Amino acid sequence: MKKGLITSILALTFTGLQAQPLPATPKLVVTLTIDQLRTDYMEAFSSLYGEKGFKRLMREGKVFYQTEFPFSGTDRASAIAAIYSGTTPSMNGIISQQWMNANTLRPMNCVDDPAFMGNFTDESSSPSQLLTSTIADELKVATRNKGMVYAIAPSRDAAILAAGHSGNGAFWLNENTGKWCSTTYYSEFPWWVSQYNERQSPDFRIRDMVWEPIHPINRYTFLPEWRDQPFKYKFDSERINK
C-alpha cells in the first residue's frame, strides 16, 4: 500500500514537471553597476523614479537587501571585480584600483598592461591582472562564443573588469579629451565609435550641459540638509574631469 502511494506521487510529480514549459533563453542581458548607490537610496527616492526604470526592476525583479562580500577596504575596482566574478580579492587578484609594482617599485593601475596599445588614449590596458572568470566570460562559454559582450563605463578599470577576459569590447571616457577610448586587447576598434568621437563625443557638447536636479528641490524630502543648498554645475572650464 505504501509502495503504491509513493509511486503515484512520483508519477504525478514527473508529469507536472514535463507539463511546464522551459523558460525562454534571454536574448539580452544588461548589467548596471552604480557606484555609491546604497539600497536605502533605492527606497528613499522611489517616488521620483519612472515606471519603466528602477520601479520596474524592484517590482518585477529579485531584490537582495543584505548582500555582502567578506572583505573590507573596497574601492571601485575591487568592488566591480567582486561583483562580476563572485569572488574576493584574494582569489580574483584585484585588491585595489592601484598597488605597488614589486618589480618597478612604482604604483600601477590594476588594468595596466604595456603589451597592448590604447585606442584614443595613451594608456595601455588589459584584464590580465584579473585571475578569475567573470559573468561575461561565462556568458561567452555558455553561448559557445556566439554571444556579444560589451562594457561601457566612465573609467577604464570599471569597463575592462566588467568586460572580462573574453569580451568583444570595453569603452571608457578619456578624461583629458572627452572621447571614448579602448585597448587593442579586444577586437578591432569599431568604426562607429570612431565616428561618434569625431562628431558627437562629449567634448563637443559638454560646454552646453548643466548638471542639476531633475525635479524641484522640495521634492527631495529625504535630503533635508541639502534643501538650502541648491546644486547647479556647468562644464565650461578647461579643467581635467570637467
Would you name each region that the model predicts?
Residues M1-A24:
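Bacterial Sec-dependent N-terminal signal peptides
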Residues T39-E43, R76, A159-A163:
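Extracytoplasmic/secreted cell-surface and envelope-processing proteins
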Residues R38-A44, E68-P70, T121-P127:
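Second-shell loop/turn segments in exported
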Residues S96-K242:
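His/Asp/Glu-rich, glycine-adjacent segments
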Residues V30-D40, F116-F120, K242:
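Acidic/histidine-rich, surface-exposed loop or edge segments in extracytoplasmic proteins
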Residues P26-R38, L57, I83, L139:
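Beta-strand elements within well-structured catalytic alpha/beta cores of enzymes
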Residues M42-M91, M148-I152:
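Short, structured active-site-proximal loop/turn typified by the sulfatase FGly-forming signature C/S-X-P-X-R
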